[in-house]
Structure formats: structure tokens, C-alpha cells
Amino acid sequence: TRVASGDRLVLIAPGYDECEPSRSPVRSRVERGTRPPNESPGTEVVRRVLVLGWNLRVPALAAEFGTYGDERYEMQVASKVPVSEREALLKHGPTPSPSVTLTHVEVDFTDPEEMQALGPGTKDSVVFMGADWTDSPEEADARTLMGSLMIDEPLREGARRPTVIMELLDPDNATLVSRSRGELIISPLFLSHLLTQIALRAELQSVFDELFAVGGVEITFRPVALYTQSRPFSFEELERAASAVGETALGVRARSTGSVELNPPKTKAWDDPSDRDLVTLVTT
């Protein structure tokens, strides 16, 4: 992409001072390609997702899954909300892609027997959605926390553990969730951060629209081993490897701790690629 007069750059930095033009010599040009890393054309991946709970974000989630061209999703939604109400809301939302198979089950996932019947251990991902039909955010979070506790021990004893994602509505409840039990999203806190950023810099809305809208550009994690087998390996090496396949390297995540280092120094190096994921910006 050539930068034209009037274009504005999107920079990732610790603060505004670090966004000033550098006086250091310009690095050599990095070639940019388009081929996804280590993927065979036409290979379709089937992912099984169990969604526990229902709110107005579930239709958008199904639509987002449908934007991944080489992946097919079998999405099962379990909630106390009547299936007829869910289907009525789906008709007014984004049309799911044919690559997404959506099935509904009307159950109370806080009941141990009904949770076991859903077979969370057989899924690739388990997503707890904060219920919007309860009397309060606290009650919705209580259901999410109860459900996560019920599946925690069986999943730990299983041969493979699915990815667990929990949506909470009250930030005060975040301390009740151990990182080892899954990834955590606090929707109101996340939205407040976005609104604050947009209020300070209105032009950032176009960036967030691109990142969070269905399709387009997204941030994802991919194993470092897809980009390099070097020991040690530097972030500059990852930048070049990602650019060669049409991606933009943003940082590195340690799998063992879940910690993320964004925009590290180019010379920063790590020893073991098997314990690291690349945080990368990709186009779906």
C-alpha cells in the first residue's frame, strides 16, 4: 500500500511521545505477500462450538464465524430462552453463512445433568454468553460462574481441553475467575474503553469499525512455529515472516502464562517457539 497525501497512519505505541518520527536510519524494505502460512488450498476445518447462554450478540457471533472461508462451524446454543424467541431474533440479524450450522437446545446449563448431556468436553470451544434476560448483571454472572465451575473439573480430566471463553457483565466479578479456567471478556468495561478512546480521538472509530465488524481485518493468535523454527528468534524475524504472508505482527503471547507483549523491541528474542503465539493482524 502506498501512502498518499492526506492519508493518516495508525500507530501502536506506549504513548503519544513514542509516535514522533524516528531519526534512526530507515530499515530495509519488507516484502509483503498474500499466501496464508502452512495452509493447503481447499482444506476445510470443522470447529464445534458450544454457546452457553443467550443475548443479542449471539447472532453477530454466528455471522462472524461465517466469514472464515476455509472453516465450517457446528454451533450449538444452549439457553433457557425459548427457541422460538431466538429464531425470531435471528431473522432480524445478519444472515448466517451456509458454513455455519446453528442448532438450539432449550436447557438450564446450571443443572449438572443437563450440562453433562451437552458434552462440553467434545467441543473445540465453549463460550459463556452473559444472559440479558436476568434481573441483574450479578445474576447473569452468577449463572456464568456456576456453569464454568461445573465444567472445570471434567474438562481438566479429559484427554483434550476445549478453549473456554467467559463473558461477564460486572467487572467486580473478574477476581472470581482463575486464568487457568479460560479467557475472560468483561463487555461493559470493554465498551467503556472503546468509547473513551473514540471520545478522545474520533477518527479511531473507523479503526475499531474495521477491527470488530463482521469480516475484514482481525487480530488473532497463531503459533510462532508457523513463521520460524529458529532458536532463538527475534521479533524482527517474526515481522518479516508475517509480512511475507500478508499479515502484520503486533506482539507475542506466552502460552504457559497467557501474558501478551505488544509491540516489543525489534531485537527482543525468545528461545522456544513452541511456547509462543504470534499476535498478528490478518485479513479474513
What are these regions (language model features)?
Residues T1-T284:
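Cytosolic regulatory regions of ion transport systems
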